A protein has these predicted regions:
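Ribosome-associated RNA-binding proteins
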Residues: 1-250
Length: 250
């Protein structure tokens, strides 16, 4: 049996870096790992209605002037499109605001500038509430920022989520994979490989299929490889999606 190596962990010395960058006392190490897990979990809960999150980077500075640990949290997420913003804001209105006025929603739909401002206000509100909750729970200083990704087809995680959404809508997996590859071809990336595993198209026997376009040199340490593993929950069961992107050599 062949043994697979994680493409990003294999290149931590050369082209990749850890998503959590900090050093800690060995007695505090488990609690810090748990804190990182809770931060990422709360971010998924707080921003899932508005953003498609790619990754969350956590950087700790040991001490500041007030002898408190300072934690920088950077959220890498897709910049929301107008239609998606309206749909997600409307969902937020109906779920969180009582007696939401349909005229307000139609005004947001017709005025993109107002919609963007309202979305940014909601994001800032969520950032403030999340920062306050983390400060109360852990007693540390937190700085949360959002780094928007303009093109979702330059990020492996967002491509995997896109394919997963298509599969959950019962789109044939070959069509979803071909659409993703065609959109990646419009970018400056050198190559892409996509693997889909599970009960594809509802067939009882599970299998794996993959498709590649361009070069994806997984054995070259200089290669800048972006990797993501996602899952889609369909009516036939869980389907696994793996995406490799090759952006060039350093």
């Amino acid at each position: 049996m062949g043994h697979k190596t994680h493409p990003q962990g294999f290149r931590l010395v050369t082209t990749q870096k850890h998503l959590s960058e900090w050093y800690g006392n060995k007695l505090l190490y488990p609690s810090l790992i748990e804190e990182d897990f809770v931060i990422r979990q709360k971010i998924d809960i707080s921003f899932s209605e508005f953003l498609s999150i790619s990754k969350v980077e956590i950087n700790r500075i040991n001490q500041n002037v007030e002898n408190k640990e300072y934690v920088n949290v950077t959220i890498h997420a897709l910049y929301p499109r107008a239609k998606e913003m309206y749909r997600k804001v409307a969902k937020y209105f109906t779920n969180n605001i009582e007696n939401s006025n349909p005229k307000t929603l139609s005004l947001l739909n017709n005025n993109k500038g107002t919609l963007k401002r309202f979305t940014s206000l909601l994001l800032k509100r969520n950032i403030r509430s999340l920062t306050r909750a983390l400060q109360v729970k852990y007693g540390k200083n937190y700085s949360i920022s959002i780094n928007f990704i303009k093109n979702p087809f330059e990020d492996a995680s967002l491509i995997g989520k896109y394919i997963g959404e298509q599969l959950e809508k019962r789109v044939p997996f070959r069509r979803a994979v071909k659409q993703a590859i065609k959109k990646v071809q419009l970018t400056d990336l050198k190559g892409i490989k996509i693997q889909v595993s599970g009960r594809l198209n509802g067939i009882e026997m599970a299998r794996s299929e993959w498709k590649r376009d361009g070069r994806v040199p997984l054995h070259t340490l200089r290669a800048n490889i972006d990797y993501s593993s996602q899952r889609a929950e369909t009516i036939y069961g869980t389907i696994g999606i793996k995406v490799w992107l090759f952006a060039g050599e350093t």
